[in-house]
Amino acid sequence: KDNFCYICSSHFLICHFLMNSFLYRIASTFYQHHQDKLNAFTFVFPNRRAGLFFQKYLSEITKKPLFSPEIITIESCFLQASNLELADKLSNLFKIYNIYKTISKSNESFDTFAFWGEMLLADFNEVDKHRVDARQLFTNISELKEIDTFFEVFTENQVLAIQQFWKDFEPSRRNASRDQFVATWSILFPVYEQFKKELLSEGLGYEGMIAKWVTDKLLNNEDIPWFNDKQFVFIGFNALNPCEKVLMTELQKKEQADFYWDYEAPELRDNNNPASLFFKENTRQFKSKYEIKPQAESLDNTQIELIEIPSSVGQTKEIYHILNALYPKNEENSFLNTAVVIPDENLLLPLLYAVPEHINKINVTMGYPMQFTPVAGLMEDRKSTRLNS
């Protein structure tokens, strides 16, 4: 069978690919070279799904029982190296709320703060992952004279553009919105610093904080026992953040790292194609020890069929027929090479109901809003009953 995909009125994408995949060929290469010594390696992947498929391919290739190598995600790699525990997101939200209230002297309720607090946690995470100087980033810009001078240079069109996002923006005068913005911005670094300090004292951290903690120690040549006597193989990465680059670079210097990049598609090797942005940099800086055999089946042979269907309900019903036609019933692992991609999360439940009955194992890798679940509907009905009784 060739590679192929069906596109149903631009809503659903069903892809099927052959078994001779990138991960399969890497598993085969390492088995050929090491066989009984595979457990000496730690294979690191961008996500858990890739690691699970790599482990599956290893089990198919091996002819005899052997000790499995360690297969982890990049987040798990940082976590195990740090000896810290990953803090619970809800606990982090309460912690940063209390810190914010203490530093800002605010009486803001948790309900009001929660939405902004989640964004703050996400920003702190990105700051650390990208190894940004937080003190410089969260610069105190409370000197209103400088702000007013900055705002006054805007043209009328620029002011109108800003007002689309900040409706109270008025460069000619001070207002409560601007004062609140300045007051909030001025305390972000103290909040960030105190938040990390409290987490560290409890042996906790969030992903970005843990990654930065590990890479800081590596750059300072401090010993991290977990890395000792390990050989790491990084597989399938693309857009590396600064923490990941530091980790790979430092392990490479110690001859403890090997790298494999999935850049076989012609588009990824075309310098004029934006998709090739990371190709040259990654393959030049992080080279592979073994040459991986190219995919036997060219991606140029991919068959694409467009199916025009006017409604979402009709699309889900068509998927039932497509999946039924792809594989015979009771064929073991027949759907492991098939992906159904939906851009609209509201169609997830109708899609699940449309899956043929003989498919009893499905891996759903997208989120689904609680408000659309049957439980949420039940709770809404109970609330309505209580209010109207």
Question: Which residues fall in each region the model found?
Answer:
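Nucleic acid-machinery interaction/catalytic patches
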Residues: C5-R386
